[in-house]
């Protein structure tokens, strides 16, 4: 049994990622898609066997999924995470299988597939021919972002990557605006930080340059603005109690700034 587990944990991911790097060197379009599927599967297998520390966000997800076991599906509307019902539904379905590692495996596979597909789209649009550069980019992103920045903050990074893919698809006219808005709506039901993805549309829609500038200043300097606004609020108000932990740094700021900077 231990040999089988070793093969699944170590050998199979290495084979998948190695095969993906091999296929991406081929000069065929279908090989590019096959390669990013194989690499994403390899990363998903690693993620499946990743065990979080007790202080990690992923551990909270495991706790929620365990609480969903032996309950009806209606539990997703009054337990778990507020308003992110699509995420709660995914958690509920996985909880019924009792294979909790599927949660990070699925998000890892889909997230990295979109990330690598985005790189391929940009690569093709720029008409770059050297596949070694592409392989280097894929491996660099894996080494820099996989465990500490992706798996441990899996929902917001998944939404960021998927949103970035569809932002680029919208900019290059591969999809229409209403398709993009549907994607943003679905992503916001996984993590509310996805709503910042509509900011580029809002900036484009507002034609007045001064208003555009004021909006962007408000986004990039939202921290001191929120601090000033909070000083005017009663300390027992709902808004004060919700925003204060963010300003104090006691909760994760959901990487909204990185999403805005990217766009």
Map each language-model feature to its residues.
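Transmembrane signal-anchor helices characteristic of membrane glycosylation enzymes that use polyprenol
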Residues: 2-55, 222-224
């Amino acid at each position: 049994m231990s040999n089988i587990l070793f093969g699944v944990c170590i050998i199979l991911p290495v084979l998948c990622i190695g095969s993906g790097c091999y296929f991406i060197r081929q000069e065929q379009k279908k090989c590019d898609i096959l390669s990013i599927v194989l690499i994403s599967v390899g990363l998903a297998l690693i993620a499946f066997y990743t065990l979080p520390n007790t202080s990690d966000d992923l551990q909270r997800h495991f706790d929620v999924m365990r609480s969903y076991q032996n309950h009806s599906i209606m539990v997703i509307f009054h337990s778990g995470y507020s308003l992110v019902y699509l995420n709660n539904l995914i958690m509920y379905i996985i909880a019924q299988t009792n294979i909790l590692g599927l949660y990070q495996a699925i998000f890892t596979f889909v997230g990295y597939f979109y990330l690598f597909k985005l790189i391929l789209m940009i690569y093709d649009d720029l008409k770059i021919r050297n596949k070694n550069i592409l392989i280097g980019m894929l491996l660099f992103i894996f080494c820099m972002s996989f465990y500490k920045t992706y798996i441990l903050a899996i929902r917001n990074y998944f939404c960021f990557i998927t949103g970035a893919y569809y932002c680029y698809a919208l900019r290059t006219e591969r999809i229409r605006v209403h398709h993009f808005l549907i994607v943003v709506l679905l992503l916001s039901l996984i993590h509310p930080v996805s709503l910042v993805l509509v900011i580029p549309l809002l900036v484009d829609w507002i034609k007045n340059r001064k208003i555009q500038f004021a909006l962007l200043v408000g986004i990039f300097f939202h921290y001191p603005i929120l601090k000033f606004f909070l000083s005017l609020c009663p300390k027992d108000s709902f808004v004060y109690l919700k925003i204060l932990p963010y300003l104090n740094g006691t909760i994760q700021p959901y990487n909204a700034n990185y999403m805005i900077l990217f766009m």
